From Swiss-Prot:
UniProt region (Disordered), positions on chain: 1-23
Listed name of the protein: Probable trehalose-phosphate phosphatase F
Keywords linked to the UniProt accession: Hydrolase, Stress response
Similarity comment: family membership: Belongs to the trehalose phosphatase family.
Ranges in coiled-coil conformation: none
Pathway terms, separated by semicolons: Glycan biosynthesis; trehalose biosynthesis
Cofactor(s) needed for function: a divalent metal cation
Catalytic reactions on record: alpha,alpha-trehalose 6-phosphate + H2O = alpha,alpha-trehalose + phosphate
Entry EC number(s): 3.1.3.12
GO molecular-function terms, A-Z: trehalose-phosphatase activity
Role according to the record: Removes the phosphate from trehalose 6-phosphate to produce free trehalose. Trehalose accumulation in plant may improve abiotic stress tolerance. Participates in the regulation of trehalose metabolism.
Biological process terms in GO annotation: trehalose biosynthetic process
This protein's record includes keyword Hydrolase: yes
Length: 368
Protein backbone atom coordinates (compact mmCIF):
# COMPACT_ATOMS: atom_id res chain seq x y z
CA UNK A 1 0.00 0.00 0.00
CA UNK A 2 1.06 3.61 -0.54
CA UNK A 3 -0.05 5.83 2.28
CA UNK A 4 -0.40 9.50 1.43
CA UNK A 5 1.71 11.57 3.76
CA UNK A 6 -1.07 14.05 4.48
CA UNK A 7 -3.33 11.57 6.20
CA UNK A 8 -4.27 12.91 9.62
CA UNK A 9 -4.42 10.82 12.75
CA UNK A 10 -7.65 10.66 14.71
CA UNK A 11 -8.61 13.70 16.73
CA UNK A 12 -11.03 14.30 19.54
CA UNK A 13 -14.18 16.28 19.02
CA UNK A 14 -13.85 18.34 22.24
CA UNK A 15 -10.97 20.16 23.98
CA UNK A 16 -8.99 18.36 26.63
CA UNK A 17 -9.21 19.10 30.36
CA UNK A 18 -6.38 18.53 32.78
CA UNK A 19 -6.51 15.03 34.24
CA UNK A 20 -4.18 12.51 35.82
CA UNK A 21 -2.52 11.08 32.71
CA UNK A 22 -0.49 8.50 34.60
CA UNK A 23 -3.76 7.05 35.87
CA UNK A 24 -5.26 6.88 32.40
CA UNK A 25 -2.17 5.90 30.45
CA UNK A 26 -3.08 8.21 27.55
CA UNK A 27 -1.63 11.40 26.12
CA UNK A 28 -3.39 14.75 26.30
CA UNK A 29 -4.15 14.86 22.60
CA UNK A 30 -6.67 12.07 23.13
CA UNK A 31 -8.54 13.75 26.00
CA UNK A 32 -12.20 14.72 25.88
CA UNK A 33 -14.24 17.25 27.86
CA UNK A 34 -15.01 16.57 31.51
CA UNK A 35 -17.27 13.57 32.14
CA UNK A 36 -20.82 14.58 33.12
CA UNK A 37 -21.94 12.67 36.19
CA UNK A 38 -24.88 10.43 35.27
CA UNK A 39 -28.16 10.33 37.17
CA UNK A 40 -27.81 8.51 40.45
CA UNK A 41 -31.14 6.63 40.31
CA UNK A 42 -31.05 3.42 38.30
CA UNK A 43 -28.36 4.52 35.83
CA UNK A 44 -28.64 1.68 33.33
CA UNK A 45 -32.41 2.11 32.98
CA UNK A 46 -32.29 5.91 32.72
CA UNK A 47 -29.60 5.70 30.04
CA UNK A 48 -31.44 3.06 28.02
CA UNK A 49 -28.76 0.37 28.28
CA UNK A 50 -31.08 -2.29 29.65
CA UNK A 51 -33.63 -1.61 26.91
CA UNK A 52 -30.88 -1.91 24.30
CA UNK A 53 -29.74 -5.22 25.74
CA UNK A 54 -33.29 -6.61 25.70
CA UNK A 55 -33.98 -5.37 22.17
CA UNK A 56 -31.02 -7.36 20.83
CA UNK A 57 -32.65 -10.64 21.89
CA UNK A 58 -33.44 -12.64 18.73
CA UNK A 59 -37.07 -13.55 17.88
CA UNK A 60 -36.42 -17.23 17.30
CA UNK A 61 -33.79 -19.43 15.69
CA UNK A 62 -33.77 -22.09 13.04
CA UNK A 63 -31.05 -24.00 11.26
CA UNK A 64 -30.25 -22.70 7.78
CA UNK A 65 -27.72 -25.02 6.21
CA UNK A 66 -24.67 -24.78 8.50
CA UNK A 67 -25.71 -21.59 10.24
CA UNK A 68 -27.77 -20.89 13.34
CA UNK A 69 -29.44 -17.59 12.46
CA UNK A 70 -32.07 -15.21 13.72
CA UNK A 71 -35.17 -15.59 11.57
CA UNK A 72 -38.31 -13.55 11.04
CA UNK A 73 -41.37 -15.26 9.48
CA UNK A 74 -41.35 -15.16 5.68
CA UNK A 75 -45.03 -14.12 5.55
CA UNK A 76 -44.60 -11.30 8.03
CA UNK A 77 -45.75 -7.99 6.53
CA UNK A 78 -42.99 -6.00 8.24
CA UNK A 79 -40.39 -8.36 6.79
CA UNK A 80 -41.74 -7.95 3.26
CA UNK A 81 -41.89 -4.18 3.62
CA UNK A 82 -38.33 -4.15 4.94
CA UNK A 83 -37.12 -6.19 1.97
CA UNK A 84 -38.55 -3.56 -0.35
CA UNK A 85 -36.42 -0.93 1.38
CA UNK A 86 -33.33 -3.16 1.66
CA UNK A 87 -33.58 -5.59 -1.27
CA UNK A 88 -31.53 -8.76 -1.45
CA UNK A 89 -28.04 -8.15 -2.83
CA UNK A 90 -28.36 -11.50 -4.61
CA UNK A 91 -31.69 -10.73 -6.29
CA UNK A 92 -30.39 -7.25 -7.12
CA UNK A 93 -27.04 -8.40 -8.43
CA UNK A 94 -27.77 -7.34 -12.02
CA UNK A 95 -28.23 -3.77 -10.79
CA UNK A 96 -25.07 -3.99 -8.69
CA UNK A 97 -23.12 -5.35 -11.67
CA UNK A 98 -24.36 -2.49 -13.85
CA UNK A 99 -23.04 0.02 -11.32
CA UNK A 100 -19.76 -1.88 -10.96
CA UNK A 101 -18.96 -2.04 -14.67
CA UNK A 102 -15.61 -0.36 -15.40
CA UNK A 103 -15.26 0.57 -11.73
CA UNK A 104 -12.46 -0.14 -9.27
CA UNK A 105 -14.09 -2.35 -6.64
CA UNK A 106 -12.83 -2.66 -3.07
CA UNK A 107 -14.46 -5.15 -0.70
CA UNK A 108 -14.75 -4.74 3.07
CA UNK A 109 -16.09 -7.50 5.32
CA UNK A 110 -17.02 -7.87 8.96
CA UNK A 111 -16.23 -11.27 10.50
CA UNK A 112 -18.71 -12.42 13.18
CA UNK A 113 -22.21 -12.84 11.78
CA UNK A 114 -20.96 -12.11 8.27
CA UNK A 115 -18.25 -14.63 7.42
CA UNK A 116 -18.96 -16.87 10.41
CA UNK A 117 -22.16 -17.69 12.29
CA UNK A 118 -23.14 -15.97 15.51
CA UNK A 119 -22.63 -18.67 18.14
CA UNK A 120 -22.93 -18.90 21.92
CA UNK A 121 -19.15 -19.10 22.40
CA UNK A 122 -17.20 -16.44 20.42
CA UNK A 123 -14.20 -18.79 20.29
CA UNK A 124 -16.31 -21.24 18.27
CA UNK A 125 -17.22 -18.72 15.55
CA UNK A 126 -15.23 -20.61 12.94
CA UNK A 127 -15.17 -19.63 9.29
CA UNK A 128 -16.00 -22.57 7.02
CA UNK A 129 -13.51 -23.75 4.39
CA UNK A 130 -16.05 -22.91 1.69
CA UNK A 131 -16.37 -19.34 2.96
CA UNK A 132 -12.58 -18.98 3.22
CA UNK A 133 -12.27 -20.14 -0.39
CA UNK A 134 -14.90 -17.63 -1.50
CA UNK A 135 -13.13 -14.76 0.29
CA UNK A 136 -9.78 -15.81 -1.16
CA UNK A 137 -11.27 -15.78 -4.66
CA UNK A 138 -12.68 -12.30 -4.10
CA UNK A 139 -9.25 -11.07 -2.97
CA UNK A 140 -7.71 -12.38 -6.19
CA UNK A 141 -9.81 -9.83 -8.13
CA UNK A 142 -10.33 -6.93 -5.73
CA UNK A 143 -8.55 -5.35 -2.74
CA UNK A 144 -10.26 -7.02 0.22
CA UNK A 145 -10.17 -6.17 3.92
CA UNK A 146 -11.61 -7.62 7.11
CA UNK A 147 -12.71 -4.96 9.62
CA UNK A 148 -13.68 -6.66 12.87
CA UNK A 149 -14.39 -5.81 16.48
CA UNK A 150 -12.05 -8.63 17.46
CA UNK A 151 -8.35 -8.03 17.97
CA UNK A 152 -6.41 -7.92 14.72
CA UNK A 153 -4.26 -10.90 15.71
CA UNK A 154 -7.35 -12.97 16.55
CA UNK A 155 -9.23 -12.23 13.34
CA UNK A 156 -6.09 -12.96 11.29
CA UNK A 157 -5.77 -16.26 13.11
CA UNK A 158 -9.41 -17.12 12.35
CA UNK A 159 -9.29 -16.13 8.67
CA UNK A 160 -5.72 -17.14 7.85
CA UNK A 161 -5.48 -15.51 4.42
CA UNK A 162 -2.35 -13.48 3.67
CA UNK A 163 -4.01 -11.86 0.64
CA UNK A 164 -6.22 -9.66 2.81
CA UNK A 165 -5.86 -6.44 4.76
CA UNK A 166 -6.82 -6.69 8.43
CA UNK A 167 -8.25 -4.11 10.81
CA UNK A 168 -9.07 -5.15 14.37
CA UNK A 169 -10.77 -3.44 17.32
CA UNK A 170 -13.34 -1.74 15.06
CA UNK A 171 -10.60 -0.29 12.87
CA UNK A 172 -8.34 0.96 15.66
CA UNK A 173 -5.59 -1.53 14.75
CA UNK A 174 -4.79 -1.70 11.03
CA UNK A 175 -2.00 -3.76 9.48
CA UNK A 176 -0.69 -2.10 6.34
CA UNK A 177 2.25 -2.40 3.98
CA UNK A 178 2.57 1.39 4.08
CA UNK A 179 5.35 3.12 6.00
CA UNK A 180 3.51 6.44 6.17
CA UNK A 181 4.25 9.04 8.89
CA UNK A 182 1.41 7.86 11.13
CA UNK A 183 2.42 4.19 10.98
CA UNK A 184 5.05 2.33 12.95
CA UNK A 185 6.90 -0.93 12.47
CA UNK A 186 6.16 -4.05 14.50
CA UNK A 187 6.50 -7.83 14.25
CA UNK A 188 3.56 -10.13 13.58
CA UNK A 189 2.93 -13.59 15.05
CA UNK A 190 5.03 -15.17 12.31
CA UNK A 191 7.99 -12.93 13.13
CA UNK A 192 7.58 -10.83 9.98
CA UNK A 193 8.02 -7.07 10.10
CA UNK A 194 4.76 -5.22 9.45
CA UNK A 195 3.55 -1.62 9.52
CA UNK A 196 0.70 -0.75 11.84
CA UNK A 197 -1.66 2.19 12.14
CA UNK A 198 -3.12 2.42 15.67
CA UNK A 199 -4.91 5.72 16.37
CA UNK A 200 -5.78 4.63 19.94
CA UNK A 201 -2.38 3.24 20.88
CA UNK A 202 -2.13 5.36 24.04
CA UNK A 203 -5.23 3.65 25.44
CA UNK A 204 -3.76 0.13 25.60
CA UNK A 205 -2.79 0.30 29.31
CA UNK A 206 -6.17 1.64 30.47
CA UNK A 207 -8.12 -0.87 28.36
CA UNK A 208 -6.06 -3.67 29.89
CA UNK A 209 -6.75 -2.30 33.36
CA UNK A 210 -10.51 -2.15 32.72
CA UNK A 211 -10.48 -5.64 31.21
CA UNK A 212 -8.84 -7.18 34.28
CA UNK A 213 -11.30 -5.45 36.61
CA UNK A 214 -14.34 -6.50 34.57
CA UNK A 215 -13.15 -10.11 34.59
CA UNK A 216 -13.30 -9.99 38.39
CA UNK A 217 -16.67 -8.23 38.42
CA UNK A 218 -18.26 -10.84 36.13
CA UNK A 219 -16.89 -13.94 37.87
CA UNK A 220 -20.11 -14.62 39.78
CA UNK A 221 -22.39 -14.23 36.72
CA UNK A 222 -22.90 -17.54 34.96
CA UNK A 223 -22.34 -17.35 31.21
CA UNK A 224 -20.69 -13.92 31.16
CA UNK A 225 -17.50 -13.68 29.11
CA UNK A 226 -15.05 -10.78 29.08
CA UNK A 227 -12.56 -10.34 26.23
CA UNK A 228 -9.61 -8.01 25.69
CA UNK A 229 -9.37 -6.86 22.08
CA UNK A 230 -6.35 -4.65 22.87
CA UNK A 231 -8.06 -1.36 22.01
CA UNK A 232 -11.46 -2.24 23.41
CA UNK A 233 -12.86 -4.66 25.98
CA UNK A 234 -16.11 -6.57 25.54
CA UNK A 235 -18.56 -8.20 27.92
CA UNK A 236 -20.62 -10.92 26.21
CA UNK A 237 -23.97 -11.80 27.78
CA UNK A 238 -25.40 -14.13 25.10
CA UNK A 239 -25.24 -17.08 27.52
CA UNK A 240 -26.40 -15.13 30.58
CA UNK A 241 -29.87 -15.52 32.10
CA UNK A 242 -31.89 -12.43 31.19
CA UNK A 243 -32.60 -11.70 34.86
CA UNK A 244 -28.86 -11.04 35.30
CA UNK A 245 -28.57 -8.57 32.43
CA UNK A 246 -29.34 -5.52 34.62
CA UNK A 247 -26.56 -6.61 36.99
CA UNK A 248 -24.04 -6.78 34.13
CA UNK A 249 -25.10 -3.42 32.72
CA UNK A 250 -25.00 -1.72 36.12
CA UNK A 251 -21.57 -3.09 37.04
CA UNK A 252 -20.01 -2.09 33.73
CA UNK A 253 -21.72 1.30 33.78
CA UNK A 254 -20.67 2.02 37.37
CA UNK A 255 -17.06 0.99 36.79
CA UNK A 256 -16.68 3.22 33.73
CA UNK A 257 -17.56 6.30 35.81
CA UNK A 258 -13.89 6.22 36.81
CA UNK A 259 -12.79 6.48 33.17
CA UNK A 260 -14.09 9.64 31.47
CA UNK A 261 -11.96 8.88 28.38
CA UNK A 262 -13.75 5.59 27.72
CA UNK A 263 -17.26 5.03 26.40
CA UNK A 264 -19.72 2.17 26.43
CA UNK A 265 -21.24 0.91 23.18
CA UNK A 266 -23.66 -1.89 22.40
CA UNK A 267 -23.46 -4.71 19.86
CA UNK A 268 -25.23 -8.03 19.37
CA UNK A 269 -25.46 -9.44 22.90
CA UNK A 270 -22.27 -7.61 23.88
CA UNK A 271 -21.30 -4.44 25.74
CA UNK A 272 -18.07 -2.87 24.51
CA UNK A 273 -15.74 -0.45 26.26
CA UNK A 274 -13.96 1.77 23.75
CA UNK A 275 -11.72 4.86 23.77
CA UNK A 276 -13.39 8.21 23.25
CA UNK A 277 -11.73 9.12 19.97
CA UNK A 278 -13.13 10.12 16.62
CA UNK A 279 -12.51 6.74 15.02
CA UNK A 280 -14.74 3.88 13.90
CA UNK A 281 -15.18 1.38 11.08
CA UNK A 282 -16.15 4.18 8.72
CA UNK A 283 -12.90 6.01 9.38
CA UNK A 284 -11.06 2.71 8.93
CA UNK A 285 -12.62 2.30 5.48
CA UNK A 286 -11.52 5.82 4.53
CA UNK A 287 -7.98 5.13 5.80
CA UNK A 288 -7.70 1.86 3.87
CA UNK A 289 -9.00 3.44 0.67
CA UNK A 290 -6.44 6.23 1.04
CA UNK A 291 -3.71 3.68 1.78
CA UNK A 292 -4.62 1.86 -1.41
CA UNK A 293 -4.49 5.08 -3.42
CA UNK A 294 -8.20 4.85 -4.17
CA UNK A 295 -9.71 7.62 -2.06
CA UNK A 296 -9.81 10.22 -4.83
CA UNK A 297 -10.78 7.91 -7.66
CA UNK A 298 -14.00 8.83 -9.47
CA UNK A 299 -14.37 5.26 -10.70
CA UNK A 300 -14.25 3.70 -7.21
CA UNK A 301 -16.98 1.34 -5.97
CA UNK A 302 -16.45 0.15 -2.39
CA UNK A 303 -18.68 -2.65 -1.08
CA UNK A 304 -19.02 -3.17 2.67
CA UNK A 305 -20.79 -6.23 4.11
CA UNK A 306 -21.56 -6.41 7.83
CA UNK A 307 -24.20 -7.35 10.36
CA UNK A 308 -23.49 -5.32 13.50
CA UNK A 309 -24.40 -1.85 14.72
CA UNK A 310 -20.71 -0.92 14.50
CA UNK A 311 -20.85 -1.52 10.74
CA UNK A 312 -23.35 1.33 10.38
CA UNK A 313 -20.51 3.87 10.52
CA UNK A 314 -19.01 2.26 7.42
CA UNK A 315 -22.40 2.09 5.67
CA UNK A 316 -22.89 5.79 6.40
CA UNK A 317 -19.49 6.75 4.96
CA UNK A 318 -20.36 5.03 1.68
CA UNK A 319 -23.90 6.45 1.58
CA UNK A 320 -22.85 10.01 2.44
CA UNK A 321 -20.03 9.85 -0.10
CA UNK A 322 -22.52 8.71 -2.75
CA UNK A 323 -20.20 5.97 -3.94
CA UNK A 324 -20.38 2.29 -3.26
CA UNK A 325 -22.89 0.72 -0.95
CA UNK A 326 -23.33 -1.20 2.26
CA UNK A 327 -24.93 -4.62 2.53
CA UNK A 328 -26.55 -5.43 5.87
CA UNK A 329 -26.53 -9.07 6.97
CA UNK A 330 -29.79 -9.58 8.86
CA UNK A 331 -32.83 -11.83 8.78
CA UNK A 332 -34.91 -9.46 10.91
CA UNK A 333 -36.10 -5.95 9.95
CA UNK A 334 -34.05 -3.06 11.31
CA UNK A 335 -33.14 0.40 10.12
CA UNK A 336 -29.77 0.77 8.45
CA UNK A 337 -27.56 3.01 6.32
CA UNK A 338 -27.02 0.05 3.99
CA UNK A 339 -28.55 -0.17 0.53
CA UNK A 340 -28.99 -3.94 0.27
CA UNK A 341 -29.36 -6.93 2.57
CA UNK A 342 -28.36 -10.58 2.90
CA UNK A 343 -30.03 -12.92 5.38
CA UNK A 344 -27.07 -14.82 6.83
CA UNK A 345 -23.48 -15.97 6.18
CA UNK A 346 -24.66 -18.58 3.68
CA UNK A 347 -26.09 -15.78 1.53
CA UNK A 348 -22.88 -13.76 2.01
CA UNK A 349 -20.96 -16.70 0.57
CA UNK A 350 -23.37 -16.93 -2.36
CA UNK A 351 -23.03 -13.20 -3.05
CA UNK A 352 -19.21 -13.36 -2.94
CA UNK A 353 -19.17 -16.31 -5.34
CA UNK A 354 -21.53 -14.44 -7.67
CA UNK A 355 -19.24 -11.40 -7.53
CA UNK A 356 -16.24 -13.56 -8.47
CA UNK A 357 -18.14 -15.18 -11.32
CA UNK A 358 -19.04 -11.73 -12.64
CA UNK A 359 -15.42 -10.56 -12.30
CA UNK A 360 -14.22 -13.54 -14.34
CA UNK A 361 -16.70 -12.77 -17.11
CA UNK A 362 -15.68 -9.11 -17.12
CA UNK A 363 -12.01 -10.05 -17.33
CA UNK A 364 -12.63 -12.43 -20.21
CA UNK A 365 -14.74 -9.90 -22.11
CA UNK A 366 -12.26 -7.03 -21.74
CA UNK A 367 -9.03 -9.02 -21.87
CA UNK A 368 -7.72 -7.33 -18.70
Amino acid sequence: MDLNSNHKSSVLKDPSPSVNQSRLGVSSRFMMSQWKKPAKLDDVRSNGWLDAMISSSPPRKKLVKDFNVEVAPEDDFAQRAWMVKYPSAISSFAHIAAQAKKKKIAVFLDYDGTLSPIVDDPDRAIMSDAMRSAVKDVASYFPTAIISGRSRDKVYQLVGLTELYYAGSHGMDIMTSSDGPNCFKSTDQQGKEVNLFQPAREFIPVIDEVFRTLVEKMKDIKGAKVENHKFCASVHYRNVDEKDWPIIAQRVHDHLKQYPRLRLTHGRKVLEVRPVIDWNKGRAVEFLLESLGLSNKDDLLPIYIGDDTTDEDAFKVLRDGNRGFGILVSSIPKESNAFYSLRDPSEVKKFLKTLVKWAKLEKNSTGF
